[in-house]
């Protein structure tokens, strides 16, 4: 049973559901994290993974950008590899590298060794959600997970990869092993997101960070069916669902197909694709989210203001072209060197437009 709140005044929830919001809603991927001095102070006492499994710490980090920026949505502080850790995978998040897997998954036996997760193994994450639901007031909470393809890539490569060569080799040369791995990861992702929904998140986002490395044909064959099963299983719970990847211009239409009609669905767009162009690629009834280049935030306020105004105008053109709604965001996560004051001013600007 969901403990989800009724938030009829939320601009974010209105936009993603295809209703007219009271203002352009804005939040930022990685709004909670390395750009905030209060986060860096807290991290001196906790590793990244430890923070994800400490409910009070995860709650505090999630709340920090809400207090500072007054964004229209909170996103749970976590990491896409958290459910892998809960499933018994030996991994760490290494500074300036990312997730590193101690024993990469290369064989059927490796796939078989991945354990399922349950509410007990992710209890600290769900406890953090419940703390946040009690503290956020009228601000909606977005839960999230990594898409099966992106999780598989980390497991097979052993960490971040430029070419994803081992991942693609398994896909193409050992499709049975590949789909067995993807089936396990799909089950894991579903359980992780269902737990968050039952604990009270108001929306979810699935990050397919590495999907842009695939051709459209390979994406449709090796990744989309598994992501679609995640969304199909969650659809009955009625939460808005966002599908996001980087470098996915040619995949946007297929990504929008993962969420079936009748559900509030959003596709995230990176800075390489105009929002109005994205509106022509996605399925009818799809809202869009994006897509300011995060690097623009390092270029000084005149450049930020100029670019942000252009993005909001593009978002409005996208709605005129058929997008169900529009949410302002970056095209990827906030960079660590970003001045928090710029983000505060950016939120105020977007709200004024």
Curated annotation (Swiss-Prot):
GO biological process terms, semicolon-separated: protoporphyrinogen IX biosynthetic process
UniProt GO cellular component terms: cytosol
Transmembrane segment boundaries: none
Site positions for Transition state stabilizer: 79
Keyword Cytoplasm among record annotations: yes
Single GO MF descriptor: uroporphyrinogen decarboxylase activity
Main location: cytoplasm
InterPro entries listed in its UniProt record: UROD/MetE-like_sf, Uroporphyrinogen_deCO2ase_HemE, Uroporphyrinogen_deCOase
Binding site for substrate: 30-34, 79, 154, 209, 332
Keyword Cytoplasm: yes
PROSITE patterns named among the record's database cross-references: UROD_1, UROD_2
Enzyme's top EC category: lyase
Stored HAMAP family: URO_D
Family: Belongs to the uroporphyrinogen decarboxylase family.
Subunit comment: Homodimer.
Protein name listed in UniProt: Uroporphyrinogen decarboxylase
């Amino acid at each position: 049973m969901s403990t989800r709140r009724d938030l009829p005044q939320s601009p974010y929830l209105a936009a993603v559901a295809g209703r007219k919001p009271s203002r352009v809603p804005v939040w930022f991927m990685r709004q909670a994290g390395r750009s905030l001095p209060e986060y860096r102070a807290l991290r001196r006492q906790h590793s990244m993974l430890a923070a994800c499994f400490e409910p009070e710490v995860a709650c505090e980090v999630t709340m920090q950008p809400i207090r500072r920026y007054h964004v229209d949505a909170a996103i749970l502080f976590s990491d896409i590899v958290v459910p892998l850790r809960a499933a018994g995978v030996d991994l760490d998040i290494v500074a300036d590298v990312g997730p590193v897997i101690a024993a990469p998954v290369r064989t059927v036996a490796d796939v078989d060794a991945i354990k399922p997760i349950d509410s007990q193994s992710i209890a600290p994450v769900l406890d953090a959600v419940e703390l946040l639901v009690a503290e956020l007031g009228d601000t909606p909470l977005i839960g999230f997970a990594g898409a099966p393809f992106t999780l598989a890539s980390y497991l097979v490569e052993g960490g971040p990869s430029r070419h994803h060569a081992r991942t693609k080799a398994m896909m193409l040369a050992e499709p049975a092993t590949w789909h067995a791995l993807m089936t396990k990861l799909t089950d894991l992702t579903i359980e992780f997101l269902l737990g968050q929904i039952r604990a009270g998140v108001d929306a979810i986002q699935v990050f397919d960070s590495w999907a842009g490395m695939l051709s459209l044909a390979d994406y449709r064959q090796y990744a989309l069916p598994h992501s679609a099963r995640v969304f199909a299983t969650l659809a009955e719970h009625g939460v808005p669902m966002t599908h996001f990847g980087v470098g996915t211009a040619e995949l946007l239409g297929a990504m929008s197909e993962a969420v079936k009609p009748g559900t509030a669905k959003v596709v995230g767009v990176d800075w390489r694709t105009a929002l109005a162009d994205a509106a022509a690629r996605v399925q009818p009834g799809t809202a869009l989210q994006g897509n300011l280049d995060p690097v623009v935030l390092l270029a000084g306020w005149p450049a930020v203001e100029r670019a942000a105004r252009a993005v909001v105008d593009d978002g409005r053109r996208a709605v005129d072209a058929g997008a169900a709604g529009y949410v302002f965001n970056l095209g990827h996560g906030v960079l660590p060197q970003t001045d928090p004051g710029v983000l505060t001013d950016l939120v105020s600007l977007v709200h004024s437009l």
